Amino acid sequence: MLKYRTLSRSCHIFHPKSLSNNTLKSETTQELLQTVGFVRRSQVGLFQWLPLGLRSLNKVSNAIRNRMDSDGGAIEVSLSAISSKALWQATDRWNNSELFKLKDSKGKQYCLTATCEEDITDLMKNYIASYKDMPITIYQMTRKYRDEIRPRGGILRGREFLMKDAYSFASNEEDAFASFQKLDDTYNKIFKDLKIPFVSAWADSGDIGGEFSKEFHLIHESGEDTLMSCKHCGDISTLDMSQSYPEKDGQYSGDVDCKYALTKDHSTLICFYYPKDRQLNWNLALNAMDKDIDLTLRNKPNDHVLQVYEKDNEDIMFSKILRVMDCRLNSKSNFPDFPLKKYLKNNFGQISDVSIVDAQENEICGKCEEGRLEPLKSIEVGHIFLLGNKYSKPLNVKFVDKENKNETFVHMGCYGIGVSRLVGAIAELGRDSNGFRWPAIMAPYKVSICTGPNNPENSQRLQDVKSELLNDPTMQNLQNDILDQFNEKLGIGARIKLSHAMGIPLCVIVGSKSWPNVEIEVRGIRWGEKDLWRKQFEKRCSELQWKCTKNEHGIEKHTVPIQHLAEVIGVLLKDM
């Protein structure tokens, strides 16, 4: 007989004593996570994980870990949460305002790790000596810290969060890209295992830097990010990587905005002109200039850029000026005055017919040049990108190549999933007026058993149901995954309501009137294939005396004799 692990009654202390319909409907998702007992906020941006939330967090972590080990071929480590100032100075990231900084008793400075590029590179420097030691991918699942100025969105954007961060090391660009593709495939499998609808989008790697870059998002109206999706070719890109064109060029005659930039050698002043009601897209601007822009001046005001230009060029009269015109402008557009008083027209160059502003809804897709773009609000949950030698070079991580030369820097990649953020995002995705709806793989429990008040008859029925489930060989994965202990003061209706609010996919209702038949209320969402259970139902309903109905609230209910309960639950869980 399989042994069933019962829950300690002390866990009830973290459950809500009551849940009103108004609370379930009106609270934000992040507030409801606290009310139902998944987390509790201790300070702004800081959360304590309670038993329910920790179970879900650990299940997501294990799902990620399983794929990283089996498909990603990665090796797990655990780095210190405290990193030295020297490492971050070497990569010119110490002045990042989001770092939590601290000193020891001797005055030495450290930071709490927000990411671990510096530390993992410094670690692997001790173990990579030859090209034969690569490719290799290292990962960890640890807490990270960011001093967010305005933490918001609960566990979606806190000052402390659990993150899976992986780093690949390769001897050449080809192997580095192969690692990128391997982890891209692994990430797709991770999110498919979680049975959640996700999209991947080409993206900008941001301040961390890098070449190939892809983000993974959950589509939801509450998301802070915007993706642009083409209805024709299916391309999905982040807003900063999406290129669009108007229906017809040169149709904008209104006020024009201008942003100044310099080429990398500061010999040429670049003037980007675009409609005043649009936002300059720096990635598109870079493409228009074949990457020849000094991005350190990107966020500087125009006056500052002009001062640098005048300082670095002896005679402005003979210096080069390049105008880059967005394709929406025409000769009648209201251009701002040119700031330089002395210049030669012969030194002016011009690039026209390029799109250099953020895409908008219904504009033409820059990828296929046929379809229309549609904006999608989303929540970013993962990001993978190649780093090149951005970190291996300043930290001097070299290796002996095939020619026996020790002059080549390691090629790196970075692969992150916000684990705690993912829990918060899925909470948003599956939330309804009754609470949460989790995929079975990450629900705090897969099954709940709800009975009436404690008395000998109800206790015996509860034991019979548990024995039927846990003595079935096919139900071994339900060990320690059944919630049957509730506050004794809660009636059967309140227990069912609490189970639904917690998002437990299946609620087994054991009542005296229907016994020895039991009811199963389906709370889980069938995120993937929706009809697997129905095929089994049509095939075996007579054999198992299995009935399926929907009540007046649209809740799917299954009725089955206790001796067939395990088989039916096994079928129902497969597509949740």
From Swiss-Prot:
Protein's cellular compartments: Mitochondrion
Top-level taxon of the source organism: Eukaryota
Pfam family, one: tRNA-synt_2b
Key word Mitochondrion present: yes
Keyword Zinc-finger: no
Gene3D superfamilies the record matches: Anticodon-binding domain, Bira Bifunctional Protein, Domain 2
Molecular function GO terms recorded: ATP binding; proline-tRNA ligase activity
E.C. number(s) listed in UniProt: 6.1.1.15
SUPFAM superfamilies: Class II aaRS ABD-related, Class II aaRS and biotin synthetases
Cellular compartments per GO CC: mitochondrion
Keyword terms: Aminoacyl-tRNA synthetase, ATP-binding, Ligase, Mitochondrion, Nucleotide-binding, Protein biosynthesis
Catalytic activity: tRNA(Pro) + L-proline + ATP = L-prolyl-tRNA(Pro) + AMP + diphosphate
UniProt GO BP: prolyl-tRNA aminoacylation
InterPro entries: aa-tRNA-synt_IIb, aa-tRNA-synth_II, aa-tRNA-synth_II/BPL/LPL, Anticodon-bd_dom_sf, Pro-tRNA-ligase_IIa, Pro-tRNA-synth_IIa_bac-type, Pro-tRNA_synthetase, ProRS_core_prok
Protein family membership: Belongs to the class-II aminoacyl-tRNA synthetase family.
Note: Present with 477 molecules/cell in log phase SD medium.
Official protein name in the record: Probable proline--tRNA ligase, mitochondrial
